[in-house]
Regions:
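Protein kinase catalytic-loop region centered on the HRD/HxD motif
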Residues: 69-78
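Short, glycine/acidic-enriched loop or turn micro-motifs at the edges of active sites
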Residues: 30, 41, 85, 103, ...
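C-lobe/activation-segment region of protein kinase-like
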Residues: 97, 101-181
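Conserved structural core of kinase catalytic domains
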Residues: 20-63
Length: 181
């Protein structure tokens, strides 16, 4: 409903203002339940990974850039909530753009960040088994982002978790899922 739509618009504005590669919001029409936003050019990551004409090197670059885009989001204390290879667009330079923030949230607890990464891990393993080390390549982009961008900035709600803390939580989530699976 309205709350979810308003939340999505607010989060998009927050992260766009911070310079993250996401669609610009042009209008929020509560009456008709619509958000009008910029159309992003690119192909879904799922299509890039399944396209036999795309060289492995380019697929790896798309995965690495996708990991960096997710870390940039997490550095803003925002979890995606529906991270998948359908919700990442890849442009002709293999840069990554995140889309579909309907389930995203401003968050400071490390658990949901780890869950974002775990969902991507599961999707890469299940939907893209032909991509060797897909999650490792994605996570290398995630980790390298902090090295490129430097120290985290404290936000109004506190400090977002460090990449290393999120990686540790990913391992915790993986072990819980394996144990209960």
């Amino acid at each position: 409903g309205y709350r979810r739509m308003l939340s999505e618009a607010r989060i998009l504005l927050r992260i766009k203002d911070a310079g993250l590669p996401v669609p610009a919001v042009w209008d929020v029409d509560l009456e008709n339940g619509r958000i009008v936003m910029e159309r992003m050019n690119g192909r879904p990551l799922i299509d890039i990974l399944r396209d036999d004409s795309v060289p492995d090197e380019s697929k790896h670059l798309a995965l690495e850039n996708s990991g960096a885009a997710v870390r940039m989001l997490h550095r803003m204390a925002v979890t995606h909530g529906d991270l998948s290879t359908n919700n990442i667009l890849i442009d002709e330079s293999y840069d990554a753009y995140l889309i579909d923030f309907g389930l995203s949230a401003v968050e400071y607890e490390v658990e949901r960040f780890g869950i974002d990464l775990h969902v991507m891990d599961e999707i890469l393993g299940a939907s893209h088994p032909n991509i060797t080390d897909g999650i490792e390549i994605f996570l290398s982009g995630y980790l390298n982002c902090d090295q490129l961008m430097g120290a985290l900035t404290e936000l109004s709600g506190g400090m977002p978790p460090l990449a290393g803390e999120v990686m540790k939580r990913l391992e915790d989530v993986r072990s819980r899922v394996r144990y209960h699976g």
